[in-house]
Swiss-Prot record:
This is Urease accessory protein UreG. Its main location: cytoplasm. Keywords: Chaperone, Cytoplasm, GTP-binding, Nickel insertion, Nucleotide-binding. One of its GO terms (biological process) is urea catabolic process. Disruption phenotype: Cells missing this gene do not produce urease; addition of Ni(2+) to cell cultures does not compensate this loss of function. Normal amounts of apourease are produced by the cells. Has no effect on hydrogenase activity. Belongs to the SIMIBI class G3E GTPase family. UreG subfamily. It is found in: Cytoplasm. The lineage of its organism: Bacteria, Pseudomonadati, Campylobacterota, Epsilonproteobacteria, Campylobacterales.
Length: 200
């Protein structure tokens, strides 16, 4: 089983990304999802209503307090959820773990996630990639989402591309408009090639 951690600020598109990925990959792979919310099961409920996955393949973890603690310093609640999911479905090939909405410094504990995808969005401005932080600089894949909003918020995608290249060096990044399913195929290809080590 490959565990893929997905984190990023509130509203960047993490839940929508997971919903799109499960829709694209469900027929070919055995999938499951763990979501993290501070005080509610909101993301888990959204996934249950909108995902192609049955609700028993989705676990919502209520982290309380700081969401980044539950994915890094004290990942015990999430590790228990991983264990529970493996007991329910021993055949799981990909487990997506969504962090609670957090800032640019959120990262996953290596024992919780094998790979990390960090999602930011254009609406936060074109300066976000150059601000750096562990998510932008060290994640295995950076997704710059909501590219359709660039003209409305005055964000320059060329500047974002330049800064992402500079901050990430050789690490990959992708531009997406998840709501319109733009760029999702490229994310699926990245997962197949780098996380599942498939020859595409």
């Amino acid at each position: 089983m490959v565990k893929i951690g997905i984190c990023g600020p509130v509203g960047s598109g993490k839940t929508a990304l997971i919903e799109s990925l499960t829709r694209k990959m469900n027929e070919q792979y055995s999938l499951a999802v763990i979501t993290n919310d501070i005080y509610t099961q909101e993301d888990a409920e959204f996934m249950s209503k909108n995902s192609v996955l049955p609700s028993e393949r989705i676990i919502g973890v209520e982290t309380g307090g700081c969401p980044h603690t539950a994915i890094r310093e004290d990942a015990s609640m999430n590790l228990e959820a991983v264990e529970e999911m493996q007991e329910r479905f021993p055949d799981i090939e990909i487990l997506f773990i969504e962090s609670g909405g957090d800032n640019l410094s959120a990262t996953f504990s290596p024992e919780l996630a094998d790979f990390t995808i960090f999602v930011i969005d254009v609406a936060q401005g074109d300066k976000i990639p150059r601000k750096g932080g562990p998510g932008i600089m060290r994640s295995d894949l950076l997704i710059i989402n909501k590219i359709d909003l660039a003209p409305y918020v005055g964000a320059n995608l060329s500047i974002m591309e330049r800064d992402a290249k500079k901050m990430r060096e050789d690490k990959p990044f992708l531009f997406t408009n998840i709501r319109a399913k733009e760029g999702i195929d490229a994310v699926v290809e990245w997962i197949k090639k780098y996380a599942l080590l498939e020859d595409i």
